[in-house]
């Protein structure tokens, strides 16, 4: 059974799921490593440690789930990013769908009565006072992280599973997606089912991972900044400065 030569489809699947198994395991254990967290905080100030620590994790994910598998698939099978839905093209219909669904997702998070629970996990950079630079780093690193994430799930995995049929491909994709969210709690694991179905459908409908990426990015940033606003131990430095300026202008001594 194991002596038969692998077909190109089988080699593709081995590369993709092997890369995911190794890459996600590496990311997960480093992300949850107390010793690594302590090492960052010993070497840098608290704010700088949080920025560098989270940037390291997200760039690692970008490499192990995006860059490395793409290099292997390209070098061994001659595949390109376009084969997995990473197409650089503009589509007004696609842009409109992304915009509407992003507003819906952000609105759902905004009106969610349980959004206070987000404070325990988001934003992942545990910084007391956020500057514009911190916000920019958060957005850029989340973007790189989720680009690799969606390329792996809705690009590599979905394409590799399509020979077994659309429903099998989508079902397995969602199952793995849910498993990846279990460490974040029951609510996120359950929410991964409809969200996973939606982004799989968008990917198949448009033949591109960009709708899934932009929608996932909107979700991640909404979680981050709504949680930041709800956390009494965190604040935006610009708001504090503007508030202080307002109080000075209203003071009789001004």
Identify what each model region corresponds to.
Residues 2, 41-54, 75-145, 159-163, ...:
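Juxtamembrane helix-loop-helix connectors linking adjacent transmembrane helices
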Residues 4-77, 81, 86, 94-97:
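Alpha-helical transmembrane segments in multi-pass membrane proteins
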Residues 27, 32, 170-174, 178-180, ...:
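Functionally important transmembrane alpha-helices
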């Amino acid at each position: 059974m194991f002596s038969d030569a692998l077909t190109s489809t089988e080699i593709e699947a081995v590369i993709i799921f092997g890369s995911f198994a190794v890459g996600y395991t590496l990311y997960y254990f480093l992300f949850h490593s107390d010793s690594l967290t302590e090492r960052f905080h010993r070497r840098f100030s608290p704010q700088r440690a949080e920025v560098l620590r989270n940037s390291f994790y997200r760039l690692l994910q970008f490499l192990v789930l995006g860059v490395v598998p793409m290099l292997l698939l390209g070098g061994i099978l001659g595949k390109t990013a376009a084969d997995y839905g990473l197409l650089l093209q503009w589509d007004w219909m696609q842009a409109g769908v992304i915009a509407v669904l992003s507003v819906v997702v952000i609105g759902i998070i905004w009106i969610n009565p349980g959004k206070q629970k987000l404070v325990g996990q988001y934003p992942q950079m545990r910084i007391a006072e956020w500057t514009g630079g911190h916000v920019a780093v958060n957005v850029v690193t989340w973007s790189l992280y989720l680009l690799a994430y969606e390329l792996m799930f809705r690009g590599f995995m979905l394409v590799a599973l399509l020979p077994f049929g659309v429903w099998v491909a989508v079902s397995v994709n969602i199952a793995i997606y849910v498993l990846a969210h279990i460490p974040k709690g029951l609510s996120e694991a359950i929410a991964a089912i409809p969200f996973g179905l939606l982004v799989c459908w968008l990917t198949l409908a448009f033949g591109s991972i960009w709708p899934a990426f932009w929608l996932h990015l909107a979700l991640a940033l909404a979680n981050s900044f709504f949680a930041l606003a709800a956390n009494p131990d965190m604040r935006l430095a610009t708001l504090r400065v503007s508030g202080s300026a307002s109080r000075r202008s209203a003071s009789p001594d001004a």
